[in-house]
Amino acid sequence: MRLLGRLFFIIRKFRKKKQLLRSDLGMYDVIIIGAGVSGAATARELSRYKVKACVIEKEEDVCCGTSKANSAIVHAGYDAAEGSLMAKLNVKGNQMMEQLSKDLDFPFKKNGSLVVCLHEEDMPNLQALYDRGVANGVKELRILNCKELKEMEPNISDQAYAALYAPTAGIVCPFNLNIAMAENANVNGVEFKFDTEVTDLKPIDEG
C-alpha cells in the first residue's frame, strides 16, 4: 500500500485530569478513529496485510460508545436500500458472522427474525421488505400467514396477520464480538491508543 499523504493528528490526552497535551502520534499507513465494533473489525481486516495501522480511541477501552448499547441483532439485510453500500455490507457481514464466531470464540446464535404485520392493509409494506431483501441477496426469506406464524411462535398475538421471516438473522454478544476483534487485530500488530481524542486533522505536504 502506498502512503498517499501525511496527517498530523492533534490529540488530547486524558490522564487523571492532567493538563491537556498536544502530540504527534507518528507515521502510519492507516489511522482508524474509534475502537467500537466498526473500528475493531476494520483493524482486524487490515492486520492481514503489511500495513502499519493504529486505532485511536478517546475512551479508556474498546466498546465504550454505541457498540456497547445496541440491540445485538445480526440483521439479515432486507431493510437497507437496494443497491446501497449498507445493503452490501449487511448481507456480507451476516454471511461472515457464523465463521467469525468460531474463529474468534464469541457467542452467536442464528435464531432468525420476524417482522409482524397486524392488519391486511399493511401487507404491501411487508411485501416491499421481502422484495428488497431478495434484491439485496438475502437467502431463505419467507412471508408467513397467520397459521404458519402461530405454529412457529405460539406466543404471538392473536391479532398477527402475517410476518416476514428471515432465518439468516441472529443475535450476538456485542461486547465479546468487539473485544475479540480488537484483541485479534492487536495480536496481529495493530496498535491501540486509548484515552486519546482526535480533535483536528491537518493535511501537510509530503516531503
Segments predicted by a language model, with ranges:
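Short loop/edge segments at beta-strand edges and connector loops
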Residues: 57, 110, 145, 194-196
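Helical element adjacent to the flavin cofactor pocket in flavoenzyme catalytic cores
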Residues: 164-207
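N-terminal Rossmann-like FAD-binding beta1-loop-alpha1 element of flavoenzymes
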Residues: 28-55
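Dinucleotide-binding Rossmann-like beta1-alpha1 core, especially the glycine-rich loop
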Residues: 72-152, 161
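Short phosphate-binding/catalytic loops that engage adenosine nucleotides
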Residues: 51, 138, 190
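Glycine-rich FAD pyrophosphate-binding loop
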Residues: 47-69
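Extreme N-terminal leader/targeting segments of oxidoreductases
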Residues: 2-30, 48
